[in-house]
């Protein structure tokens, strides 16, 4: 998504773009907005074709990881490497609607008796928020209109997107797509969102319903076809990324069928190991006080909380460093600002009660006083939530028995493949 924001700014300044580089295998050799996406291993070959190339690192959250990879590829000294990161233009997420129509087990919306307020941001309030973002961060290139909520339920989403685009800022959306849209989806598509992530966890109802509680995968698939139709009808190039959450019960035939559907529709399928959210639940687990829901969910995880932390800790961040805290500002629908996007409870985790009345400096200073951060970093949870050291996660997943009906490995072992 950050690359699409950078693309807008580069085009605005008449700078030529050759390609995108992304380590996610889902994007390899695909096209985004007319530009081919290559694996980092192709960088040397690309650079050797011209002396005019420069590398623009667009993802602030993973900038250190990317620069380390460039050093490992031994090309960091052979080409100019620029950072797109601007301390005065953090990654903004605005949760325009704080409620959701589903109650997925891995998400805090499934937590009963939560005191977190539900509601939506009015169109007028959003305009005030975005105007302040532009004033505080003139170089901002992209914004996400979601955090914990379902933005496609917002009645004025199309107008919100148009308002953001008027300032040449890219828009990212995320949806479960299990929604009866009527004619609203076409209004959203006509607004040309730059990126749309579809979160799901199965192709067949038995798998999907187990982890996306309250959703209907048949409705989701119907909407995927509708989405393709509307994109073509309106000549819109929105990058559609089907973000597939991997569990024990959906990682063979389910994922293969979803990949076939995505190929048919021209969408991307990016796979991610399911995590337990929010941060408070993971810390409770680490303290030896897991709630019943987390205990039940872990039975279906390909990589347990402890395993994920162990794998991610092999690539530790510098001491007292967290990319979520330092590179993001998250704004809730009620205008409160939490310490980061991984927390749920409001209490001491809110660093500003009203974004409109707080400066970036004040927000960042308040973040330094949140005690939860110290414990989170001591437990290596920023690395866990970033999914560092994917090969380590793959290793743990490959040792697990799966329950995806009808799918047995070729050797009959019914263990998870590393593919």
Task: Give residue spans per PLM region.
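Glycine-rich adenosine-cofactor-binding loop
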Residues: 1-11, 20
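Generic structural signal for well-ordered alpha-helices
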Residues: 7, 67, 130, 158-161, ...
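NAD(P)-binding Rossmann-fold cofactor-contacting core
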Residues: 17-31
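Phosphate-bearing ligand-interacting subdomains
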Residues: 27-86
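Flexible mid-to-C-terminal extensions adjoining Fe-S/redox cofactors in radical SAM and related proteins
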Residues: 49, 88-90, 319, 330, ...
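Conserved alpha-helical substructure of the radical SAM core
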Residues: 84-195, 206, 210-218, 222, ...
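Conserved C-terminal portion of the radical SAM core fold
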Residues: 136-146, 165-172, 191-200, 218-312, ...
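Short, small/polar residue-rich loop motifs at catalytic or cofactor-binding pockets
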Residues: 322-325
């Amino acid at each position: 998504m950050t690359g699409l924001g950078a693309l807008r700014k580069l085009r605005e300044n008449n700078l030529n773009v050759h390609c995108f580089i992304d380590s996610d295998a889902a994007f390899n050799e695909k096209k985004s907005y007319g530009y081919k996406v290559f694996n980092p291993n192709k960088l040397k070959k690309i650079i050797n074709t011209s002396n005019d190339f420069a590398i623009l690192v667009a993802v602030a959250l993973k900038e250190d990881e990317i620069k380390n990879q460039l050093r490992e590829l031994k090309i960091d000294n052979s080409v100019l490497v620029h950072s797109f990161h601007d301390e005065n233009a953090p990654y903004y997420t605005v949760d325009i609607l704080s409620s959701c129509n589903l109650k997925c087990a891995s998400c805090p919306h499934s937590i009963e008796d939560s005191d977190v307020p539900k509601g939506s941001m009015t169109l007028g309030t959003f305009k005030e928020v975005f105007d302040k973002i532009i004033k505080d961060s003139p170089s901002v290139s992209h914004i996400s209109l979601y955090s914990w909520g379902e933005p496609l339920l917002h009645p004025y989403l199309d107008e919100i997107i148009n308002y953001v685009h008027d300032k040449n800022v890219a828009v990212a959306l995320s949806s479960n797509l299990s929604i009866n849209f009527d004619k609203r989806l076409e209004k959203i598509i006509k607004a040309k969102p730059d990126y749309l992530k579809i979160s799901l966890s199965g192709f067949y109802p038995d798998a999907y319903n187990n982890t996306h509680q309250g959703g209907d995968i048949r409705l989701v698939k119907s909407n995927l076809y509708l989405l393709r139709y509307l994109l073509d009808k309106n000549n819109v190039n929105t990058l559609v990324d089907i973000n597939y959450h991997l569990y024990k019960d959906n990682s063979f035939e389910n994922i293969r069928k979803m990949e076939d559907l995505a190929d048919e529709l021209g969408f991307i399928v990016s796979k991610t190991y399911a995590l337990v959210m929010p941060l408070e639940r993971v810390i409770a687990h680490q303290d030896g006080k897991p709630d019943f829901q987390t205990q039940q969910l872990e039975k279906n995880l390909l990589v347990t909380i402890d395993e994920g932390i162990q794998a991610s800790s092999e690539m530790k961040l510098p001491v007292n460093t967290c990319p979520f805290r330092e590179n993001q500002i998250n704004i809730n629908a009620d205008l409160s600002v939490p310490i980061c996007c991984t927390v749920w409870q409001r209490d001491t985790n809110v660093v500003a009660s009203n974004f409109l009345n707080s400066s970036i400096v004040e927000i960042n200073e308040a973040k330094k006083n949140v005690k939860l951060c110290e414990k989170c970093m001591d437990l290596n949870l920023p690395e866990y939530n970033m999914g560092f050291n994917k090969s380590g996660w793959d290793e743990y997943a490959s040792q697990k028995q799966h329950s995806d009906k009808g799918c047995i490995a070729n050797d009959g072992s019914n263990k998870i493949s590393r593919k």
